[in-house]
């Protein structure tokens, strides 16, 4: 019990807070430098985040087997900490906003809503709801994907590929779809992703063998792409000056979904019901984005 509490205090809370402060700051800064290509700017960052999942999976498994001075999970934490600290410090030292004139392309982002103003718009609640409903398609299955793969005909090595290719799918979704959204629009991109997530969730229910890996990789592509399009969608709707804080409030939808849906699935002891919950979430997210339209004026 005390070890668990110590882990939360020493790692989970500091790591969670650090990510919460760092990631929105980087995303909002990148959008200000590339205000005309916000999807590209955030997509490159998101792609790096997605690829980190594949690296961490392979690194931790290697650490558990042991290599050099890195032995076991404790050694993996020490090694990752030693790598992360200088990289993040160096990146933070050079991070700065561009001159004001570079931040605003002509005719765009005429609304500059503060967080308080944003929270009074229905667009905020539709966006946050869509983000929340994007989570069950992946987060209901990511903790059990190895077990699920083996139950459906894969051996342990093959089932491990669902994690690796899922990370590749995540990286591809985070990089490619925000770039596509620069050309076809954020709303159209999100509608397509939710529709694909709904179809893949249905296919995942019946998948066996390597189709489990294929469907899961597709779902991680859609889930991560939806998350990666969000920063640009946020600034399109609510403006750039408060981009970091506004994005943080929108990302609360993801936090709610990542806690609520797995909790409900475990509480109700859902097995096949997880697939129904994932499909319902994708359909609800599609409906929320379908109802989403630009903010017409500053809410007072």
Describe every region a protein language model picked out:
Residues 6-21, 132, 211-225:
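Hydrophobic core of transmembrane alpha-helices in multi-pass small-molecule transporters
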Residues 20-34, 41-42, 225-238:
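Intracellular juxtamembrane helix-capping segments at the cytosolic ends
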Residues 44, 53-54, 237-270:
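A late C-terminal transmembrane helix in Major Facilitator Superfamily
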Residues 74-93, 274-291:
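Symmetry-related core transmembrane helices of the 12-TM Major Facilitator Superfamily/SLC fold
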Residues 96-113, 299-300:
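Flexible cytoplasmic inter-helical loops of multi-pass small-molecule transporters
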Residues 116-179:
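Extracytoplasmic gate region of multi-pass secondary transporters
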Residues 174-185, 269:
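Helix-to-loop junctions at the C-terminal end of transmembrane segments
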Residues 188-203:
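Structural signature of the two symmetry-related core transmembrane helices
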């Amino acid at each position: 019990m005390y070890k668990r509490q110590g882990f939360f205090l020493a790692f989970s809370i500091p790591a969670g807070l650090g990510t919460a402060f760092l990631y929105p700051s980087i995303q909002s800064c990148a959008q200000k430098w590339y205000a005309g290509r916000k999807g590209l700017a955030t997509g490159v960052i998101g792609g790096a985040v997605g690829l980190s999942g594949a690296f961490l999976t392979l690194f931790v498994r290697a650490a558990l087997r042991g290599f050099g001075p890195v032995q076991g999970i404790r050694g993996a934490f020490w090694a990752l900490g030693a790598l992360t600290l200088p990289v993040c410090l160096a990146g933070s030292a050079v991070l700065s906003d561009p001159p004001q004139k570079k931040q605003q392309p002509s005719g765009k982002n005429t609304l500059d809503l503060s967080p308080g103003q944003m929270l009074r718009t229905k667009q905020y609640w539709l966006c946050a709801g869509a983000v929340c409903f994007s989570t069950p398609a992946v987060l209901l299955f990511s903790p059990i994907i190895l077990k699920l793969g083996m139950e459906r005909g894969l051996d342990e090595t093959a089932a491990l590929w669902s994690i690796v290719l899922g990370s590749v799918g995540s990286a591809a979704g985070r990089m490619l779809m925000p770039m596509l959204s620069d050309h076809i629009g954020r709303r159209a991109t999100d509608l397509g992703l939710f529709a694909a997530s709904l179809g893949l969730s249905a296919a995942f229910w019946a998948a066996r063998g390597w189709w489990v890996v294929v469907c899961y990789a597709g779902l991680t592509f859609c889930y991560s792409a939806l998350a990666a399009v969000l920063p640009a969608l946020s600034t399109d709707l609510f403006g750039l000056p408060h981009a970091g804080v506004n994005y943080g409030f929108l990302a609360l939808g993801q936090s709610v979904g990542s806690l609520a849906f797995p909790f409900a699935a475990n509480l109700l002891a859902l097995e096949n019901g997880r697939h129904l919950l994932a499909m319902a979430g994708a359909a609800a997210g599609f409906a929320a984005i379908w109802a989403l339209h630009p903010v017409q004026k500053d809410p007072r």
